[in-house]
Amino acid sequence: MSLMLEPNPTQIKEERIYAEMGLTDEEFAMVEKILGRLPNYTETGLFSVMWSEHCSYKNSKPVLRKFPTTGERVLQGPGEGAGIVDIGDNQAVVFKMESHNHPSAIEPYQGAATGVGGIIRDVFSMGARPVALLNSLRFGELQSPRVKYLFEEVVAGIAGYGNCIGIPTVGGEVQFDPCYEGNPLVNAMCVGLINHEDIKKGQAHGAGNTVMYVGASTGRDGIHGATFASEELSESSEAKRPAVQVGDPFMEKLLIEACLELIQSDALVGIQDMGAAGLTSSSAEMASKAGMGIEMYLDDVPQRETGMTPYEMMLSESQERMLIVVKKGREQEIVDLFEKYGLAAVTMGKVTEDKMLRLFHKGEMVAEVPADALAEEAPIYHKPSKEAAYFAEFQQMKMETPKVENYKETLFALLQQPTIASKEWVYDQYDYQVRTSTVVTPGSDAAVVRVRGTEKGLAMTTDCNSRYIYLDPEVGGKIAVAEAARNIVCSGGEPLAITDCLNFGNPEKPEIFWQIEKSVDGMSEACRTLQTPVIGGNVSMYNERSGEAVYPTPTVGMVGLVHDLKHVTTQEFKQAGDLVYVIGETKAEFGGSELQKMLHGKIFGQSPSIDLDVELKRQKQVLAAIQAGLVQSAHDVAEGGLAVAISESAIGANGLGATVKLDGEATAALFAESQSRFVITVKRENKEAFEKAVEAIQVGEVTNTNEVTIHNEENEVLLTANVDEMRKAWKGAIPCLLK
């Protein structure tokens, strides 16, 4: 498009062209008032993208303020590229999670790949070296050909980018439910390590300092990607493939090394990734955070397509690009540094004192807008909220224990449910050992990565049972945080903090906004009780297809500190003769459970309950026992209940089984999904010390029979299952469905 064809300010207003860009009538009137005139086409584009939900959080900010964001270890909370938490010895962990849902629904390979690329840039823009990747994925049922295609391509995209860039993908989760059929969720998390003195901010300080563009050249890909992420998917979304960016992991690898070298230079003032909204967000946010302005000369932007307009250059979301501010007079050092890596670094502007973002192109000023208006002054909406109609109905339901005829068959069927089944098909495509720091590989409760040069490790996990959150957003929100912490503890780590990715439907629908409010209330309470502040995250709204929303899915990414790698604990049984303990009581709680979904084809009723004080007490006891060397294996009891947890601990071991006795009604004892429960094994000689330290019930012992046998309290056998057969069923389920 040439400049001749761009509508003039009067046309933009009279023909409501701003509405096509995503601005409401009221918002356009606000822009007019801020500028004291009608905006031109480029300026309208700047406001439309910066005031989108994806960039401004205008619908979610009032809710996000409820999160606890401070703590004695928190060095950087929400507001920068990623959050930072102190781990002692002058070191810190940097991490964040983001969504790439809409792009992945349209172009799954590139959508997932660029989601990984973007989150890596957020972490190294803080000055940290990325050391691990995780992902949390949601798809429809694998029986659908479209879902199979999305699943295979998303996993290939994550693998393709992560493996090429040389950062191990060490963990995550994949869940399958019909509500994600047309709108998969792809949440990527990156974890990095940094020394305190190397922490950098995305701020443009110092009038007269130079603004430079580094990395890949700018094309027309991803224009309006942020606006696209702020609307519902529809049949016409397929036509928006151009809004999906294309990634180059080899370019990003060079960019990481160049930027980490740059961070050691005192010439650098500020650095930010050109993520959602590209040059617009990076320039406006860096200026606004520093209380400064920026002037940019767009003719100097490296362009890979001809005839690009200022509008296109400012809104492009081409990948592998960073905006940096350097001390005036030091530009050549930066050019030389990036040239060494074969990357472009060009001067394209300067920092000013007047807080304005000014853009020049072909000798003319093409935009003049207050930086704060773009970055900080988006309207904030307090959306109407209304309790979902189904909620009262579910709360009043009298829940009956599901009828199960054959316990062994039911266990095998549960092990083959895609949400429970082995995800080896997924993680075998990821290089999870690159950099040789991975201590606990995918498949256990949490991954653990060594902190080089120390005896410490970082435990990390992603968790969210969206079925519970759909049934009861507040309780489900508590459970999401508690389960993440439980997984960290089972791996020998002390939970530190969380990043979140709030995936919801259309916030303009009061029942959806109610889900958002309630789940954030639950998560906030859990974060306060478990002392895991929220240090950053991402909101992804409008996850709907043809008016049907996905389950509310506020994914929790948590990192914990393993104080000594000797404490690392995994879920599989270690040796015959060890004692098996269960911590926590089992109630007949089946709402949202894997058994309920399998038997009824839907979920209903009340979610499992949780008492956060009890949760904290149990986690502290388990962690102390692990740190005292009393624990052989630890596994959190989650989907599928105790029978599945015990089976998973046997499947992961070589030739070991277990004989256990469970009290209470058999179906609940085996398959209920009550919270705050652990399966722990302990050496016989540590029995007394363990029982003194932890409130736990001994239920049996590990055997070398290669069978799991579960009795009831009358000592009648409820089921006996061969571990090899279980392993085969559990490992074969997903590959079988993909055939």
UniProtKB/Swiss-Prot annotation:
The active site is at H54, H100. It catalyses: N(2)-formyl-N(1)-(5-phospho-beta-D-ribosyl)glycinamide + L-glutamine + ATP + H2O = 2-formamido-N(1)-(5-O-phospho-beta-D-ribosyl)acetamidine + L-glutamate + ADP + phosphate + H(+). GO terms for cellular component: cytoplasm. Keywords: ATP-binding, Cytoplasm, Ligase, Magnesium, Metal-binding, Nucleotide-binding, Purine biosynthesis. It is an enzyme of class 6 (ligase). Its EC number is 6.3.5.3. Substrate binds at S99, H100, N101, H102, R121, Q245, E317, S318, Q319, S540. GO terms for biological process: 'de novo' IMP biosynthetic process. It comes from the Bacteria. One of its GO terms (molecular function) is ATP binding. Its main location: cytoplasm. Pathway: Purine metabolism; IMP biosynthesis via de novo pathway; 5-amino-1-(5-phospho-D-ribosyl)imidazole from N(2)-formyl-N(1)-(5-phospho-D-ribosyl)glycinamide: step 1/2. Mg(2+) 2 binds at D122, D273. Pfam families: AIRS, AIRS_C, FGAR-AT_linker. It is found in: Cytoplasm. Monomer. Part of the FGAM synthase complex composed of 1 PurL, 1 PurQ and 2 PurS subunits. Belongs to the FGAMS family. Part of the phosphoribosylformylglycinamidine synthase complex involved in the purines biosynthetic pathway. Catalyzes the ATP-dependent conversion of formylglycinamide ribonucleotide (FGAR) and glutamine to yield formylglycinamidine ribonucleotide (FGAM) and glutamate. The FGAM synthase complex is composed of three subunits. PurQ produces an ammonia molecule by converting glutamine to glutamate. PurL transfers the ammonia molecule to FGAR to form FGAM in an ATP-dependent manner. HAMAP family: PurL_2. This is Phosphoribosylformylglycinamidine synthase subunit PurL.
